[in-house]
């Protein structure tokens, strides 16, 4: 087998991308995990298991995977380890080959930085005034500049970054937001070795004794989590625990410990939703960073699957059984349809509907009776009953078919999910709306089983019957339509638990999901 190609020029990479075959939705099945066309994994080389975990996820989620290898001089200060940074291109190429990478983009410094002085990207000061920022003053400007160049050159659908570099991740997410870049930044979990040491290319600088000493960083974070889980959510208690543990490592020279908001990177006095405990320390010649997210929120449960798999009924019942808020996404689309009628906006006009939905605020409040529909407000006007009228019902499908509506409502759903404690169902909840959901379920059933259930529903509702064969054809057609639609196709999240409900009662399905939830979150059950 030929080695994965190494492309060193921008023109060469663009030629490769033009020639790469494939359409995202051609031949896709509902259980496919492919949700992007091009996945980019930016690295500085010296690949290790942490990098490989990013590549493996990119391989599961994209048709084409590109790994960039560039030791970026802009992010190194004069006294730092640019010249010593490990470069192992042949070994990296072999690892990429094993993981099914399509190509490596390994430009030279002259290729990316030929026209110095370079136009640079300066992140907001609020994102660099704490953690590593004061200790590495120009580092994040260098990172943001090169990442923006890579995103522009590769034009990926999705780009993968590790959560070990939490400050870098927050800055890149903000960069994508501020520059309106059409790419999804995918945070990937921090990978540790058997001792708990966070994997890093700079771990190569550690001798055996130093590597053992370095594990105390993780031990201190575990101690912080224990303190947090014991009910101490204030800054002083959490950081004192970290400091006390780190003090037991005589070879560990602490640069900083801090507790910050994981998005704004501003210091926290109290963890009310999420807090990031971050450490930087020197062990021997190696500068090491590590972090841990402390989450006070209830988890989010995402349920996806094809039509007719029983998602709606199961999701509502699970919400009641577990104690999560059911996020009625259908009510949100009804709210937009009501607003379009109220404002006399033509729903077939994508520009008018985009303007309408961009400025509207939808609020949902659970009914005291979990069997009842939630209360709904649009722009502070209560519309719970108004969105259930026949006129609104007749308009919902046309409204939901507009990509601007879906895009805007996904943002609002994500806003509602910031406090956690939600359960939602759909076709892209776990892949698009809540990709960081604590538990993802892909609920499915055979076409034959779904047709049988539909036949029974028709009978129970005294509706005209259809044959099993007719219903199977309709369901197969719906599956194909949902999995091959251009915008938000039905996909199984790479980390979803698949439950085939053939032969299962609703009660059995609910028991299976609630058991999974209790096993994953024993302290929240």
Curated annotation (Swiss-Prot):
GO terms for molecular function: ATP binding; CMP kinase activity; dCMP kinase activity; pantoate-beta-alanine ligase activity. GO terms for cellular component: cytosol. Its main location: cytoplasm. Residues 1-292 are annotated as: Pantoate--beta-alanine ligase. It comes from Acaryochloris marina (strain MBIC 11017). This is Bifunctional pantoate ligase/cytidylate kinase. Signal peptide: none annotated. Residues 293-525 are annotated as: Cytidylate kinase. Keywords: ATP-binding, Cytoplasm, Kinase, Ligase, Multifunctional enzyme, Nucleotide-binding, Pantothenate biosynthesis, Transferase. ATP binds at residues 44-51, 162-165, 191, 199-202.
């Amino acid at each position: 087998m030929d080695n994965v190609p190494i492309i060193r020029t921008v023109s060469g990479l663009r030629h490769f991308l033009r020639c790469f075959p494939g359409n995202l939705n051609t031949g896709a099945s509902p259980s496919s995990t492919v949700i992007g066309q091009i996945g980019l994994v930016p690295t500085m080389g010296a690949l290790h298991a942490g990098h490989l975990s990013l590549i493996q996820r990119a391989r599961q989620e994209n048709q084409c995977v590109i790994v960039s290898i560039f030791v970026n001089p802009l992010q190194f200060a004069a006294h730092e380890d640019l010249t010593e940074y490990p470069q192992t291109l042949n070994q990296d190429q072999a690892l990429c080959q094993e993981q099914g990478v399509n190509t490596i983009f390994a430009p030279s410094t002259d290729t990316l930085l030929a026209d110095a002085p370079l136009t640079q990207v300066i992140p907001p000061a609020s994102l660099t005034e704490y953690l590593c920022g004061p200790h590495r003053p120009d580092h994040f400007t260098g990172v943001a500049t090169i990442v923006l160049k890579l995103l522009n050159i590769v034009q990926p659908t999705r780009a993968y970054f590790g959560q070990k570099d939490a400050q870098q991740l927050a800055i890149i997410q903000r960069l994508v937001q501020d520059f309106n870049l059409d790419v999804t930044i995918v945070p990937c979990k921090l990978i540790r070795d058997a001792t708990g040491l966070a994997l890093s290319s700079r771990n190569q600088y550690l001798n055996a004794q130093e590597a053992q000493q370095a594990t105390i960083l993780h031990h201190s974070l575990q101690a912080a989590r224990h303190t947090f889980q014991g009910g101490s959510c204030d800054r002083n208690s959490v950081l004192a625990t970290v400091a006390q543990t780190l003090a037991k490592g005589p070879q560990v020279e602490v640069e900083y410990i801090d507790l910050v908001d994981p998005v704004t990177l501003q210091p926290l006095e109290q963890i009310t939703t999420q807090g990031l405990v971050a450490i930087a320390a020197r062990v021997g010649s190696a500068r090491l960073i590590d972090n841990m997210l402390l989450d006070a929120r209830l988890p989010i449960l995402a349920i996806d699957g094809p039509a007719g798999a029983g998602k709606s009924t199961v999701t509502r019942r699970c919400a009641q059984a577990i104690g999560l808020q059911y996020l009625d996404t259908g009510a949100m689309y009804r709210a937009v349809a009501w607003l379009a009628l109220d404002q006399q906006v033509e729903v077939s006009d994508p520009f008018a509907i985009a303007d309408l939905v961009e400025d509207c605020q939808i609020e949902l409040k659970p009914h005291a009776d979990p069997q009842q529909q939630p209360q709904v407000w649009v722009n502070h006007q209560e519309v719970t009953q108004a969105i259930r009228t026949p006129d609104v019902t007749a308009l919902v499908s046309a409204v939901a078919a507009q990509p601007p509506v879906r895009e805007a409502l996904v943002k609002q759903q994500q806003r509602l999910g910031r406090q956690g404690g939600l359960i939602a169902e759909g076709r892209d909840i776990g892949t698009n709306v809540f990709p960081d959901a604590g538990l993802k379920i892909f609920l499915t059933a055979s076409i034959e089983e779904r047709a049988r259930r539909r036949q029974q529903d028709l009978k129970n509702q005294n509706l005209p019957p259809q044959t099993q064969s007719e219903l199977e054809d309709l369901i197969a057609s719906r599956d194909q339509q949902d999995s091959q639609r251009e915008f938000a196709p039905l996909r199984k999240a790479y980390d979803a638990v698949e439950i085939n409900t053939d032969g299962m009662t609703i009660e059995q399905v609910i028991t299976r999901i609630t058991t999974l939830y209790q096993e994953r979150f024993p302290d929240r059950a």
